[in-house]
Amino acid sequence: MTDNSNIPDGFKASGVSITGLRKSYGSNEVLKGIDLVVKPGEVVCLIGPSGSGKSTLLRCVNLLEQPNGGTIHVGGFETTDPDVDLDKMRQKVGMVFQQFNLFPHLTVTENCTVAQTKVLKRQASQAKEVAQKNLTHVGLADFGDRYPDELSGGQQQRVAIARALSMDPTLMLFDEPTSALDPETVGEVLAIMRSLAKAGMTMLVVTHEMSFAKEVADRVIFMDGGVVVEEGPAKDVIGNPQQPRTQDFLKRVLDPTHVQIAE
């Protein structure tokens, strides 16, 4: 759990406030009036079945998807304001995707410096120093000259985290960061996320890793059908869910032998 009263100076944490968020693709309404608050320094995990709107919600926060209604505030920015400075807002929001999204033609260090020099206008030497600090943090201090295809999936995802951290974000978004990994590399990525949570980084995480959510999250939100079905402290939502739909989902996830196949 994070200690929200003791956020290090290195992390100027941003909160998130979402009100009445709606998103449709044609006639298919994916998000149906979502209300959500993430306090500075808080870790919130979004869980639920595929197609419930979790990833769409995450992508709406930094406007990778354009909402159809509602408001989103991140730190001092109203991201849904037509006049918002998107570049400045996105500098403060780091995002880690399922599929790493590293530049294959750039080295590990270059992947971590290119946005620093182009967006933050840092000198190359400073950008490299920041990149090295974050690569060290994720356990890849000696991998700077390698290319993505020379790394395992877990190592690539750790580079993606270092790249995001190199932009000095005040909020980190994780969209199922372990779903594309081999089982033996999942733990190394989750360990980095645990360290960020412990250090006070604000995190909004879409995950199917229930043990991670129960251990690290301050709150868990269960979504289904584009709405929030249940939310609360992680130990309550995962350990003692109150809503039948949440109970059924967790029973299937935590005990796959429960699932019955229709004949």
Regions found by a protein language model. Name each.
Residues 235-263:
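C-terminal boundary and immediately downstream tail of ABC-type ATPase nucleotide-binding domains
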Residues 11-234:
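ABC family nucleotide-binding domain
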Residues 1-22, 257-263:
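ABC-family P-loop ATPase nucleotide-binding domain
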